[in-house]
Amino acid sequence: LLFLTLLTASHEISIDGRLDDASWKQAVEYTKYYESLPFTLDEPKDFQKVLILEDEKGIYLGFVNEQAKDTVRANKHERDDEMANTDKAGLAIDFDGDGLAAYSFTVSASGSISDGIYRNENEVNYDWDADWKSAVFIDENFWYIEMFIPWTIAPMKSVEGEFREVKLSFWRLLASEWRVNTTIKGNPRQEKFMSLFHPYRFKNYKVTSIDYFPYVTVSDDRLLEEIDEKFGAEIFWKIDSGKQLNIALNPDFGQVESDELVVNFSSSETFYSDKRPFFSENHSLFDVKGFTYFYIINTRRIGAAPDYNCNQFAKPQQNLCEASKVGINDIDYAIRYTQKSESFDFGFLGASEADESFSKGRDFYSFRLRKNYENISLGYLGTYTDRPILDRDADVHALDMVYRPNDKTRIDSIYISSKVDQGLGNLNKDGEAFRFRLTASPTTNRYYDAFLFFFDEDTDINDMGYQIIDDYFFGGLQSGFKKSDFSDSSIFLSNQLELGFGHERSEEHTS
């Protein structure tokens, strides 16, 4: 294990990509990389190193990548474009060092950036867009990245003592050869990724910050001769390293990027992730899910199309009700509080929608607890939704566990209980669901994966969450073998052989 205690003087560094500020002479260097794609773990053919500095403001990183200028692919791309054909380098940081969440930061040779959050060992979510700085410079034989990541960028556990231990992984992609070099013996395409991060020791700074984003909008409809005025604010308060409070008052999400176009001919609802900053920021503690099958909390439900019951009105009013339907609901307020300590985390999320014509706003509440031990994490996530137009109350309770009996095996499971009471239509149902997964990597070239999903016919978490289907069972086992020790003259970089079987049953079919 590598523990680096870094110098803690305040640094005056200009983030311009040139790495020519005097402070870089004090930096710790890291040069040990492995070729992890293909997964040979050999010494890389190309040289690269990382420079690391810190002060009370955050972490400074310098990437030095040896490469002839005429071979560098520096294509501009959209933020978070994972498949962009360009040379890249970056890192992932587990600020708590517990293997539950890691934040990734990537910079392309063009200067384009990507950031996201890793959970469940190697599952990444790119909806998180953070506020950090980077710059790139390319000369004849090297290209460089300067990066600054503030301590306020993500929630961190409150720890005692002079130092904080985080875990890091650095990487570099050479696009022309599609080779990846990493400082750990793994990558996100392997079954083990986050658990392989190297520990680093930084000074334990006490940080606090508060950001306000007020707004005022005025719209004038000259046809209807109506003037609409709206004002509100979003507040992000990082109380200290472990506590964070976010408040949105009558928020305006008009600047959020649109969803991707999805053509769906199935009977299942399409899941859309939330790109609204308030709901994507500081959400990792509440992110309890089962791959793409379910999400206990789907924040896209908050502010979605209102509920209506136009049939309760007489014909003229019924027609007016139908004509008044809107596709989104304004939000009166939303609040999120999270607190993380060395062994215990908890959080609260609540939101209330505004009343619309012929509709009443819904209320959403969620409470999260998580207890962390040396090799096991136990959690509870509960949600409650009130939908007054439907006279509907929905409760969901979920228990989750992540267990690592050794460094080669990982077990995670989630148990879900749901209950719906709806006066309109006299609908009452209780359901249960379960997810189990075991992954094992006895050697670097062999892995096993056992999995189980179950939803009974009355499971319904869709009021505040998302589930792809009900009355469903899926179980299976998969084994894989990877070969990457091919000679330089071979046409192959790596081969992978997988053998698996499974059984799937739903109300529609069995396979």
Regions found by a protein language model. Give the residues of each.
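Repeated loop/turn-to-beta-strand initiation elements of outer-membrane beta-barrel proteins
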Residues: I59, K243-L245, S343-F348, Y373-Y380, ...
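Membrane-embedded beta-strand positions of outer-membrane beta-barrel proteins
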Residues: G17, Y212-P214, I247, Y337, ...
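Hydrophobic, lipid-facing positions within transmembrane beta-strands of outer-membrane proteins
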Residues: A89, I210-Y212, E229-I235, D274, ...
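Transmembrane beta-strands of outer-membrane beta-barrel pores
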Residues: Q67, W151, L174, V216-R222, ...
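Structural preference for beta-rich elements and adjacent junctions enriched in aromatics
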Residues: L6-Y365, R370
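Exposed, low-structure sequence patches enriched in small/polar residues
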Residues: D330, A394, N406, R410-S511
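Structural signature of outer-membrane beta-barrel channels/translocons
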Residues: D94-D96, P150, F236-K238, T338-E342, ...
